[in-house]
Design a protein with these regions (language model features):
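ABC ATPase nucleotide-binding domains
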Residues: 2-9, 21, 25-32, 281-310
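Conserved catalytic motifs of ABC-family nucleotide-binding domains
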Residues: 210
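Conserved ABC ATPase "signature" region
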Residues: 156, 160, 168-185
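Catalytic Walker B motif of ABC-type/P-loop ATPase nucleotide-binding domains
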Residues: 214-218
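ABC ATPase "signature
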Residues: 273-274
Length: 310
């Protein structure tokens, strides 16, 4: 008992430390930054949400699905798929023998495919050729005109065969002659035309019935720069008023300058297609084409050519 009292006395004699409660310290806030947020860098870019392009709601003018054409054991066109929308100038580029002309010949009903389907404004080119060809204006490669006709006669019969009335044909012939600079050439026979003039009168004949889709194979071949600029202006105005153009050309610079969309065709297949910006990927169309089609083969040998020894 005495020991318990002594312990309690000792405990009561020991001073108890007071607990101090710290008051919260007020820290002044920094003003909100007015600087724009920094752009994502490095790996942060992967986390950023890439905005999705808006769906293209323009009317589909031309659809090509699974198009195939063979000549004997050679496959000229190997399953091409392509969609062309209204209001575009769609360029098709490729090396010689790529299948460009063969493809356009099937699109316009001049050559029957071995497989696949082609529709123009919903009309099957081979299932309903009358409806499809009513919408088409065609400038074929290896241009052959009725060279015994004058330019005026060629345009006249082109319009009449398309079902236009005589007064309509005469009025449109006058308009087309002015637009293409052919006023002084209409009374001359087509056989006397230069290659460039023949190309222009053929393009005028392709447009006389006011088609909705122009399919032009090498429209600028043999055409001088002034006439080419004139034709380009006509095609742009045609597109601005609701028309659509599909054309082929070997001139990458020209295709890049005037076309809104492009397809690169090599060995009968499409290697890339889309808007000009999408296909170019920040390069010139020619450089992008060489990447896809393969760079040119270095010219070797032929040392004899530089010997000048006869």
């Amino acid at each position: 008992m005495d020991s318990e009292r002594d312990a309690n006395s000792a405990a009561s004699a020991t001073p108890v430390a007071k607990t101090t409660i710290a008051r919260p310290v007020s820290v002044p806030r920094k003003p909100a930054s007015t600087r724009p947020p920094t752009k994502a860098r490095g790996n942060d870019r992967a986390a950023a949400v890439t905005p999705q392009p808006e769906p293209d709601t323009r009317e589909i003018v031309l659809t090509i699905e699974g198009l195939v054409k063979r000549f004997g054991s050679t496959t000229a066109v190997a399953g091409i798929d392509l969609t062309v929308r209204a209001g575009s100038i769609f360029g098709i580029v490729g090396p010689n023998g790529a299948g460009k002309t063969t493809t356009l010949s099937m699109v316009t009903g001049l050559l029957r495919p071995d497989a696949g389907m082609i529709t123009v404004h919903g009309a099957d080119v081979w299932g309903d050729p009358t409806a499809a060809k009513r919408e088409l204006g065609v400038l074929p490669d290896r241009l052959r005109l009725f060279d015994r006709l004058t330019g005026a006669q060629l345009l006249y019969y082109s319009g009449i065969l398309r079902g236009l009335s005589r007064p309509t044909v005469i009025a449109r012939t006058k308009d087309l002659a002015i637009a293409f600079g052919l006023e002084d050439a209409l009374d001359r026979r087509v056989t006397d035309y230069s290659a460039g003039m023949a190309k222009k009168v053929a393009l005028a004949a392709a447009m006389i019935h006011s088609p909705r889709l122009l399919v032009l194979d090498e429209p600028f071949e043999s055409v001088d720069p002034v006439s080419a600029a004139n034709v380009t202006d006509i095609l742009r105005r045609f597109v601005e008023t609701g028309g659509t153009v599909v054309l082929s050309s070997h001139s990458m610079e020209l295709i890049e300058r005037i076309c809104s969309d492009v397809a690169v065709v090599v060995n009968g297949a499409i290697l890339d297609a889309g808007t000009m910006t999408e296909v170019r990927q920040g390069k010139t169309l020619e450089k992008r084409f060489l990447e896809l089609a393969g760079d040119q083969t270095p010219a070797g040998g032929m040392e004899w050519l530089h010997s000048f020894s006869g």
